[in-house]
Every structure is written in structure tokens, then in C-alpha cells.
Amino acid sequence: MSFDLIIKNGTVILENEARVVDIAVKGGKIAAIGQDLGDAKEVMDASGLVVSPGMVDAHTHISEPGRSHWEGYETGTRAAAKGGITTMIEMPLNQLPATVDRASIELKFDAAKGKLTIDAAQLGGLVSYNIDRLHELDEVGVVGFKCFVATCGDRGIDNDFRDVNDWQFFKGAQKLGELGQPVLVHCENALICDALGEEAKSEGRVTAHDYVASRPVFTEVEAIRRVLYLAKVAGCRLHICHISSPEGVEEVTRARQEGQDVTCESCPHYFVLDTDQFEEIGTLAKCSPPIRDLENQKGMWEKLFNGEIDCLVSDHSPCPPEMKAGNIMEAWGGIAGLQNCMDVMFDEAVQKRGMSLPMFGKLMATNAADIFGLQQKGRIAPGKDADFVFIQPNSSYVLTNDDLEYRHKVSPYVGRTIGARITKTILRGDVIYDIEQGFPVAPKGQFILKHQQ
């Protein structure tokens, strides 16, 4: 049998092992894994490289339509490809209108035409004003629904995203349980965080340490406990977004041990940055939940290695530079991290701390694909989409602004020495990024809809 592509001599991350083996691709799918696979139109030599499943980033904000001056499909998905991401799950907020019904998601599909370098699945929004329309998004094919129990959205814009109160969350979770859809939650206590923030600003406490103190760990833990119980009563599968504290992870672990259907994610910035670094970097490292102290970070690494965190995500949430101006308490909260999830975490988790390659593959790709039902993604296995990233270990570089593909070339990682490099990203058998050639093909990304897999 002749194949379209054979990748030879790489250390391939399989589900339960990593070994030097060849991969054959035909028609955009993985056709065979083994040795002496035969002939192919193209042969790639991956000697000395790690071949990982392409990252499935389950938490990405692309602000198009409506706020394309923040980030757009063209720049955002190119950055993703350069960073080894082959599939993103896009959040329903930051764009205008927010993705809360059939009409708004169709606008998003139109805005992305011809611009997707990678594949993209969609989340719908659960907001205060759309509980009677959740079924529309399910029918279109979203893979989950995101909501906030922390304050969010611009109250001066009618079609912006909105947080939910406990009653709205409960009613929405009941409906999503009936639809068989998971609810994803940003967990911070809205009233307490808002009050602590206002108190700090009124007293002139506007440093990074002050911001972190205004969103203490207990506000995350309380919100996690609350939504765990409400989702359990409502009969809805739950996913906790961007957990920032080991205490928060412990709540999820406890609920799982009691039989609840719950998963969780965290982000690289909670493992590689701390509050002192946040103070040095400034507003580019502001996010919520916030980047906490070094002791908290050590606890997060322990939870990650224990297998208590299901997946790692970027929570890429950029904005125009002027929204990052001024003091930390007033600046927009969101980190541009899409391009540096894979290389930073390979360096920090695998090279510096000894994480196994199969565990790395699960955290970056496999588990997210499983959680959100992306049946063709997340694994190097026969029959799956031929999505790969080539990683060059022990190859250090210093990240510069010019390296970034974002609309706004800023990131809290600029200036960081990263000890691994993404050298090639392959989507459904085609090279979409190469460290020497850049982006050699026209955008070929597709939207992944739940009911069309």
C-alpha cells in the first residue's frame, strides 16, 4: 500500500508509551504505526524529535466578529499553529455578539471563512438572558456551554456576555443535563471579589500583590463547591475552568471520588509564573483567577503530577495594548498565551521535572479531546486525524515580540528562555507550520460540530 506521508524515526507519543516508530498517513488520517511501512509520496525524517499529538486547546478566546481589533481568526489560529495547537475549542465571549444562540454562532462561522489555520470546535454561552435558547446551540453542534459565576461582560453593551446568578446557573444546568451537554464554569465568588477589588482601589492599593489579594483562594474554592453541588442536583456534567489553586483542585478530586461527573483544567501560567514575577511583568500577566504565590504554584505542580488536573489550556484572552495601560487593578484581565503552551510546558514539565511523555500527551491533547467528544482528535492512533507537532528537545531560545503571530505582539512570556522548540505542526496530514518555511499552505482549518463527526 502506498501512503501520502510517512514520518520516520521520531519518538512518538502514543497513549501509554513513547517510542521510536514510524507513522503512515493517507487521506488526512493515520493509516498505520510501525516499522517498514512501505512507500509514500513524501517521507519526513523526525530523528531527534518528539512527535506529539497536536494540542487540543480547550479554552481559547478569538474576538471575531465584533472585536477583531483584540484578536482575529487569521492571527489567532496562525499563532496556535506555530505553537503546536491543531484544534482549539473556542469560548463564546469577547466577540460581539456573544455566542448565545443560533444567529450569533452563524455570524462567527461567517467571520472565520478562509481564515482558520487550525480546526475549531465551539462552546455556547449560558448567560442570564438565553436559557430558553440553549437548545439552538446544541442543535448547531457546540461541544459544551460556558458560564461565569464571577462578574463578567460590559453592562453598557446589550449583546455582550453576562454572568449568571445561582438560580440562572441551576436552571441552565438542568436544561444542559437534559441535552447531554457539559457546563464549563469560571469559578470565583462575584460579590466578594468585586467588593474586595473596589475596597483596594478606593484605598490606592493597585499593585499585582494587591490584585491577587483581592481574589483570594477561598473565593475560588467557595464557587467551586457551590457549582459542584448545584450541578450535581441539576444532573449536569461539570467542567471547572482554569483552576488556579491546589485547594480548588482538591474540591474537584473529592467530588470525583464521591462519583460526580466532573473534570477540570488549568493553564501554563499558573505553573510557570508567580505573584512576584507578575509584579515585574505588569499588566500583561493579569488574569482571573490571578497568578498566585510560589507556594501555591508548588501545590499546583503536585496536583498536576498526581493526575488530579485533566488538561492544560491556554485561556488565550488578549486585548488591544491600550486596555493593558495604567495600574493593574484597572487593566483588562487576560493573558496572550496561545503560542507558548506546548514549548513552555514541555520544557517545564518534561525536561525540568521529569513528566513522562504519555502524561504530557494526555494533558495537552488526549484528555481534552475525550472530555469534549472530539472523536477524531487528541491521539496518535490508526483512524484518527493526522494531527502532529514536532518538538525539538533541549533547544533553547529567547522569546521575542517579533516571534509572536498575535494581532498584538505582546505576551508575559516575552524575554523568557524556553528550552524546547516547536519545529513543525501538521493538520490532517498537511504541514501548516514549519520553523523554516513558516506557513506553507493556505488556511485549511474546519469547524468541528458535535453531530457531524
UniProtKB/Swiss-Prot annotation:
Keywords on record: Hydrolase, Metal-binding, Purine metabolism, Zinc
Biological process, per Gene Ontology: allantoin catabolic process; purine nucleobase catabolic process
Chain ranges passing through the membrane: none
Catalytic activity: (S)-allantoin + H2O = allantoate + H(+)
Matches recorded under SUPFAM superfamilies: Composite domain of metallo-dependent hydrolases, Metallo-dependent hydrolases
Annotated Zn(2+) 1 binding sites: 59, 61, 146, 315
Pathway stated in the Swiss-Prot or TrEMBL entry: Nitrogen metabolism; (S)-allantoin degradation; allantoate from (S)-allantoin: step 1/1
N6-carboxylysine PTM positions: 146
Cofactor section: Zn(2+)
Enzyme class (EC, first level): hydrolase
Family designation: Belongs to the metallo-dependent hydrolases superfamily. Allantoinase family.
Record text on subunit structure and interactions: Homotetramer.
Name of the molecule in the record: Allantoinase
Origin organism lineage: Bacteria, Pseudomonadati, Pseudomonadota, Gammaproteobacteria, Enterobacterales
